[in-house]
UniProtKB/Swiss-Prot annotation:
This is (Lyso)-N-acylphosphatidylethanolamine lipase. SUPFAM superfamilies: alpha/beta-Hydrolases. GO terms for biological process: lipid catabolic process; lipid homeostasis; N-acylphosphatidylethanolamine metabolic process; phosphatidic acid biosynthetic process; phosphatidylethanolamine acyl-chain remodeling. Its EC number is 3.1.1.-. It comes from the Eukaryota. Keywords: Hydrolase, Lipid degradation, Lipid metabolism. One of its GO terms (cellular component) is mitochondrion. Residues 70-201 form the AB hydrolase-1 domain. It comes from Homo sapiens (Human).
Length: 342
């Protein structure tokens, strides 16, 4: 279909790969459709075309009365709009909610990114701002998870007029990498597995190299995702979604690799720059009590912004994916923050 961004053939290799790597944009579209059909509220899913010909896959959920500041949600590394399924109905009850696949991820365009950390980061941020302009959103409550939190912060530094409140959910890439190994939190098994195969490869290259065994690797290394979404899906829908999001051309993944130093740290740590966000931009940081991310970052942000509103909080019984581990608590917290805006 015209709405699908299928990869163009590049000769015998690309024609052989689909039989080895059981994925396509059409398969991603189909599994995402199974996820989005769970939404109770009315939604609009479509491509938003940017002036540079890139397309951003966007899902908008709106209540009948939607005069409040919209909430924009930015997913983390390897994710996509489908992973917000536990949150979208609740968070769109009283205001419009927009979520989109980051450039280079999910169903959005997958262009070549600059290979340097600053250039890759700027490409992401520019695409978010161009998307906002194209959507005609004057200002927003901006929420980002993990890598999305890093990019939302970078965006807020550059475009503070557009951000009414910055919500950072277990944000990646804030602290400097500790020089003392004892100060490093033990990562979960899947992070260790990714780190062990990194080398010169992209973080999730193993999913593509594994060919027909790729979907099984997602289920093996991330069985927790099936449990997180068990109220909606008893089958492997979410595992399939994650696989198809990450078995495509690794455009955003390559950009992420350029930005990272090992898997847990950024080459340009955000703690060194967060003071550049304008003082009147309020920030709330939400962590899971069992996350592998350094939760002391919240206190450090408070210290760097003594004259600004900074709140950091912890949700019990949640890991890195706070929004899926404790969705009801997470939704209530985010609704409270949004209501404080208008």
């Amino acid at each position: 279909m015209a709405d699908d961004l299928e990869q163009q053939s590049q000769g015998w290799l690309s024609s052989w790969l689909p039989t080895w790597r059981p994925t396509s944009m059409s398969q991603l579209k189909n599994v995402e459709a199974r996820i989005l059909q769970c939404l109770q509220n009315k939604f609009l899913a479509r491509y938003v075309s940017l002036p540079n010909q890139n397309k951003i896959w966007t899902v908008t959920v709106s209540p009948e009365q939607n005069d409040r500041t919209p909430l924009v949600m930015v997913h983390g590394f390897g994710g996509g709009v489908g992973l917000w399924i536990l949150n979208m109905d609740s968070l769109s009850a009283r205001r419009t909610l927009h979520t989109f696949d980051l450039l280079g991820f999910g169903r959005s365009s997958r262009p070549a990114f600059p290979r340097d950390p600053e250039g890759a980061e700027d490409e992401f941020v520019t695409s978010i701002e161009t998307w906002r302009e194209t959507m005609g959103i004057p200002s927003m409550i901006l929420l980002g998870h993990s890598l999305g939190g890093f990019l939302a912060t970078s965006y807020s530094i550059k475009y503070p007029d557009r951000v009414k409140h910055l919500i950072l959910v277990d944000p990646w890439g804030f602290p400097l990498r500790p020089t003392n190994p004892s100060e490093i939190r033990a990562p979960p098994a899947w992070v260790k597995a990714v780190a062990s195969v990194l080398g010169r490869s992209n973080p999730l290259a193993v999913l593509r190299v594994a060919g027909p065994w790729g979907p099984g690797l997602v289920q093996r290394f991330r069985p927790d995702f099936k449990r997180k979404f068990a109220d909606f899906f008893e089958d492997d829908t979410i595992s399939e979604y994650i696989y198809h999001c990450n078995a495509q051309n690794p455009s955003g993944e390559t950009a992420f690799k350029a930005m990272m130093e090992s898997f847990g740290w950024a080459r340009r740590p955000m703690l060194e720059r967060i003071h550049l966000i304008r003082k009147d931009v309020p920030i709330t940081m939400i962590y899971g009590s069992d996350t592998w991310i350094d939760t002391s970052t919240g206190k450090k942000v408070k210290m760097q912004r003594p004259d600004s509103y900074v709140r950091d909080m912890e949700i019990k019984g949640a890991s890195h994916h706070v929004y899926a581990d404790q969705p009801h608590i997470f939704n209530a917290v985010v609704e409270e923050i949004c209501d404080s805006v208008d």
